[in-house]
Amino acid sequence: MLVEPQADDFKSAKQAPANPHWYKGAVFYEVLVRAFTDSNGDGTGDLRGLASRLDYIEWLGVDCLWLPPFYASPLRDGGYDISDFRAVLPEFGTVEDFVYLLDEAHRRGIRVITDLVLNHTSDSHPWFQQSRSDPDGPYGDYYVWSDDDSRYADARIIFVDTETSNWTYDPVRGQFYWHRFFAHQPDLNYENPDVQEAMLDVLRFWLDLGIDGFRLDAVPYLFEQEGTNCENLPRTHEFLKRCRKVVDDEYPGRVLLAEANQWPSDVVEYFGDPATGGDECHMAFHFPLMPRIFMAVRRESRFPISEILAQTPKIPDGCQWGIFLRNHDELTLEMVSDEERDYMYAEYAKDPRMKANIGIRRRLAPLLENDRNQLELFTALLLSLPGSPVLYYGDEIGMGDNIWLGDRDAVRTPMQWTPDRNAGFSGCDPGRIYLPVIMDPVYGYQAINVEAQRDSASSLLNWTRRMIEVRKQHHAFAEGDFVELGGSNPSVLAYKRTWIRPDGRLDIVLCVNNLSRFPQPVELDLSEHHGYTPLELTGGVQFPDIGELPYLLTLPGHGFYWFQLLDADAKARRGE
């Protein structure tokens, strides 16, 4: 058997403050370690470089960092092809550097989660090398092997651009191995109890070091069963319950976030039993919502958003959705109809180079043609719709992309800190940087960077920071009930978020969003709140009191309002 490092071999980080439901009110920020800051001049971002930028992340208002894989890897799939679950990729640093990052983050009240790729490993992982060379050895059954490639024929191929089958022949073992993703990423065999125990030990290793949780990558595909599509199988949920029990019993306060690109009715199963408040994952991404936000604004109609939220089941009390606009992958269009996918390609990916797999490899600002009003509207929706928002590094300053780079590298370029050499990312020769910094006239680092925007009160960065600050002042955004209000104008999306405070008082937030590029009026039935006063949250301006008649608002093109609805007692407490 292989000898694995243990957490006791390393110093562990200080724990974050105890708060079992911290994730419900958190603002998440996805950072690619490679892309954030290079501390040693080798052209690649690293853990020490990321630690040096924690003051900025704290200033922005971020509660939790999400780090995609930083493990040892041959890097054929951006680190999702892991060759050692207990080692850090040398160019990123060491396990000790990761513990230092955790310590520094926790000292600032920032939590850290990372991806754990449960479904597969790299084909260079020692487990796979042992499995292929010694079928009767201890690792012989760690992967899914077959004498032919006819099994599980109903399972779809995910990477249709590059893969023609989910089976690949291995000449060393003389059998086919199963892979739901790339051929160099063989799937682990979760029918083998030893595999389950090995992955639970990986979970414990990083939790012992102090990490605050995991985004569980590609969870729907852990098990296979003939005659099914090999997704969302009951055995998968059984294993996730085991993971959750380990967390609850041994590491309370840590979080499991499911990455399941499925319909809401399927994803809700990953929260587990509602009677227990949820006994699988604490959080899950709401993938189908994201493309429908883009569709709704381009069609100037609230119905794409309204319909998907209406199809979203209630989730257990202890759980929360994760919502996002962009991340390190393509803007995935798996969870839309063929007609909707064609529409999205026509509107947002006019150049064929902008497409990747079943999606669009562009950043937020270029998708929205660098329109400040749209950027603000999209961010306001992200921060106010049900769920914990996940920002993608650089979107807070409106960073661009580079569609001339291969695959998803288009949206993974270095963070733009200053207008200086290499955008302040690295002091190395520009030719050594892992990817070139953006240098075009609109999105280039000379024009778009943190330094310039921090000094400008009206910048997108300072506006985003202010909106995060406002969100945190009203817990209704985090845990409030969501009620869509309809209204007289289909171009306007209006909803209430209502939260009952511990003292029994209500925190009611009204959000009104104009999805049209033109000014729009709307009449809302707010008679339930007759006598209440809407207080606009970004400027503190009071609007006319609500009466029994429909409440009339006029919004500028792509404009929005956030109001707190104040009753007589609330106004009295404000001294009015």
Regions found by a protein language model. Name each.
Residues 1-576:
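Active-site and adjacent substrate-binding regions of carbohydrate-active enzymes
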